[in-house]
A protein has these predicted regions:
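Surface-exposed assembly/interface segments
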Residues: 1-312
Length: 312
């Protein structure tokens, strides 16, 4: 209907093209509807079912969700970041980033601060505003180039009416708000409930996805990668190429024309008997310095790959 939160959110998402320095319009959006009286469990169960057939999305923007449902969605989104044990068991990772809004100043609890992949926006008129949709509509068209989520002017969003210490308390509590200072309106910190910045979270995901895609392409397009020093170096080249992509996209810092990252390439002699028997490369360790915005953060990772031996 014309007054539905879903329609209002969609309109705010696409309206950001009206902001002078918006880089473009969001090109693809999907709307997933549930009954207005759905419980928190029914909502997360429905998302699990959706992912079985449609898992090629990243931002989760609930329209008209209650605080109870937002809390459940936070736990659900946090669980989309898999542990090493889950990955080694064969589970496929597809992270989701929850960006929700509330008018409740006590929504971000200690428990929610332990959750990953959660961004909470506060506005006194949250029932009639769509900050998450507007914010995504303003920033997402920049990608794959990384940008800070702070300082973004939004179209059609009222500034918070919180002032002084009340506003500072909310900011310190990891709420994001549309604020006004020195005659300019803009979004505040761009921070997740666990203290990570949004651009850092998305940048890590971009690196992981690029690395995985490049790895699959390398394995499919190469007739045989030997279980030897040359084979290990070829796989390490995938890591380096993915990190170079991240440098080009402004995710990883560049100094003196080079990306600020380090990759440790294992040798065949480093492999244990069990790793060799199972054709699994010893972990390729890498470390990179995230560029971030004017607000260094280091990210690390491990790539483990199973190869076919050279003589098979």
């Amino acid at each position: 209907t014309a007054s539905s939160p879903t329609l209002a959110a969609a309109q705010k998402l696409f309206d950001q093209i009206k902001v002078e320095n918006c880089p473009g319009r969001t090109k693809k959006v999907a709307i997933f509807g549930l009954a207005s009286d759905s419980t928190a469990k029914a909502t997360t169960d429905a998302l699990d079912t959706l992912r079985e057939t449609h898992d090629d999305w990243y931002f989760l923007i609930p329209a008209g969700a209650t605080d109870t449902i937002i809390t459940a969605l936070s736990t659900w989104a946090s669980a989309t970041v898999l542990t090493l044990a889950q990955l080694e068991s064969g589970m496929v990772e597809s992270e989701k980033l929850l960006i929700a809004q509330t008018k409740t100043k006590s929504l971000i609890t200690t428990a929610m601060k332990a959750n990953k992949q959660t961004v909470i926006c506060y506005n006194h008129d949250a029932d009639n505003t769509s900050i998450p949709a507007a914010w995504v509509g303003r920033v997402a068209p920049n990608y794959p180039t990384s940008v800070t989520w702070k300082w973004k002017e939004l179209f059609g969003i009222p500034v918070t009416d919180e002032k002084g210490t009340d506003r500072e308390d909310l900011l310190e509590g990891r709420y994001n708000m549309y604020i006004e200072r020195h005659g300019r309106e803009y979004m505040s910190e761009g921070i997740c409930t666990d203290g990570d910045f949004i651009d850092t979270v998305i940048g890590r995901w971009q690196i992981k996805q690029t690395m995985r895609k490049r790895l699959v392409n390398e394995l499919v397009d190469t007739e045989n990668i030997g279980y030897d020093d040359d084979g290990f170096a070829a796989i390490a080249g995938v890591v380096i190429a993915a990190l170079d992509d991240a440098v080009d996209n402004g995710i990883i810092m560049k100094q003196n024309g080079k990306g600020c990252y380090n990759v440790v390439i294992p040798k065949r002699a480093d492999a244990t008997d069990e790793q060799a028997r199972n054709r699994v490369i010893p972990p390729i360790e890498w470390e990179a310095t995230v560029r971030g915005g004017v607000h260094g953060v280091k990210v690390t990772g491990t790539l483990t790959v199973a190869l076919v031996t050279a003589n098979e």
